[in-house]
């Protein structure tokens, strides 16, 4: 464990040993990163179910539910993200392309959270709240579906249940319903101009990436296209 300094009086970075596959312990284990924010052993516990990499180490990290209800908080990094990637922890030669992704399942992620819940319930006696945002909201829903007795209340912030890798519902919604017709026209014109002026704008885009130490696993042109095409969704 590692003690961290920030908004909370007591904050710790922990690694919880988890089965790679909760239905087949013989496959071995990996270490899952967990950030514990301690207030008091009798206060409620907020379990933040991340959908991706943990952000809890940031010195200003907080959560509005934790503030509203004066809770302790556990932020759990999702398996296969950040420092919580099975197999890679033991073999530095493994890449995203060669990694075995078979155990990245809703059941396993829910079982990870269940195990963490059971461990910390031995210490904290208050009520438990589960929450997450976006894919973290999905994680909250999956977790409380598989283990409803773990949690007293779940509050997912946005919980998109996608039909597949390409859902198909977002594009017509953004094109026809989101915002006002004037808003949609302004955003469309903005996108067209950025694509037309790619050669002039791209150097500024590259400079911004370098200044913020941003690196990408795909070509810069593809990153540029993603930023332009997804701007209405982010807006």
Regions found by a protein language model. Name each.
Residues 1-72:
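Catalytic-loop region of hydrolases
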Residues 10, 63-69, 122, 143-152:
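Short, surface-exposed basic-aromatic patches at helix termini and helix-loop junctions that form
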Residues 27, 57-62, 84-88, 97, ...:
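Short, solvent-exposed loop/turn and secondary-structure capping segments
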Residues 53, 79-82, 161:
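Alpha/beta-hydrolase active-site loop signature
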Residues 66-88:
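Conserved alpha/beta-hydrolase
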Residues 100-123:
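Alpha/beta-hydrolase active-site loop
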Residues 124-134:
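Alpha/beta-hydrolase fold nucleophile elbow
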Residues 133, 142-235:
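Alpha/beta-hydrolase
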């Amino acid at each position: 464990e590692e003690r961290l300094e920030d908004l909370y009086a007591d904050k710790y970075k922990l690694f919880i040993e988890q089965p790679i596959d909760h239905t087949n312990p013989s496959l071995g284990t990996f270490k899952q990163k967990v950030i514990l924010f301690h207030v008091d052993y009798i206060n409620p516990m907020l379990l933040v179910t991340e959908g991706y990499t943990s952000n809890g180490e940031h010195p200003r990290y907080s959560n509005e539910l934790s503030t509203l209800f004066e809770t302790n908080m556990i932020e759990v990094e999702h398996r296969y993200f950040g420092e919580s990637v099975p197999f890679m922890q033991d073999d530095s030669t493994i890449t995203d392309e060669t990694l075995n992704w078979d155990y990245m399942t809703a059941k396993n992620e829910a079982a990870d959270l269940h195990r963490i819940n059971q461990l910390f319930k031995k210490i904290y006696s208050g009520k438990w709240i589960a929450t997450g945002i976006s894919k973290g909201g999905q994680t909250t829903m999956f977790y409380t579906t598989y283990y409803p007795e773990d949690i007293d209340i779940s509050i997912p912030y946005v919980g998109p249940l996608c039909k597949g890798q390409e859902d198909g519902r977002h594009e017509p919604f953004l094109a026809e319903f989101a915002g006002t017709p004037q808003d949609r026209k302004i955003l469309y014109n903005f996108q067209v101009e950025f694509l037309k002026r790619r050669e002039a704008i791209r150097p500024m885009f590259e400079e911004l990436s370098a200044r913020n130490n941003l690196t990408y696993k795909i070509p810069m042109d593809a990153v540029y296209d993603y930023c332009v095409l997804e701007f209405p969704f982010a807006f």
